[in-house]
Amino acid sequence: MKKYMLILFSYGGLKKINKHLKKKLKANDKLYVRAVMLEKVPKLFDHLISDVGFLGEKVVSDVEDSVVDICQDNAKDYLKEANELAGSMNFELDQSLIKEHNLEDLKQEVKKFDLDGIFINFSQNEFVSNQVKEEEIKNWLQKIKLPQTIFYDGKLEK
């Protein structure tokens, strides 16, 4: 039995990630899915929304809430999809939503689970990427020498 972790910072291109998982995972393997859910608007969206301030604060607040709701719905939908995939392929699934980006908790889980590999879906958007500390995560993973597969909105990094 092999153990892997999938960390989702982006919900773009999830069908491609599932294709990759189908090739990689075998029956009785275990997949830990950690889906990062936004609790507030990413800095990029915050900047764009503030530029339309003429709409009024209520509209800005509604737009911010809509963006967060869509991102949270995407996270929940993918976790349901991951359950279906686990059922059809007969691998064990452990999933949780991360309500607030906390790199230290992720590091502890990666160490604790003694993983055989990790899959991460980052965003191609540099503002979101900077917000989730992409470079810090990559540097840390290189130090612990854990095999990793990196995606950007579902596209495999070369």
Where are these regions (language model features)?
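A short acidic, amphipathic alpha-helical/loop segment
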Residues: K16-L21, D105-E109, E136
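Ordered, amphipathic secondary-structure segments that act as subunit-interaction surfaces
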Residues: D73-L85, M89
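Small/aliphatic-rich secondary-structure junction motif
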Residues: K2-S61
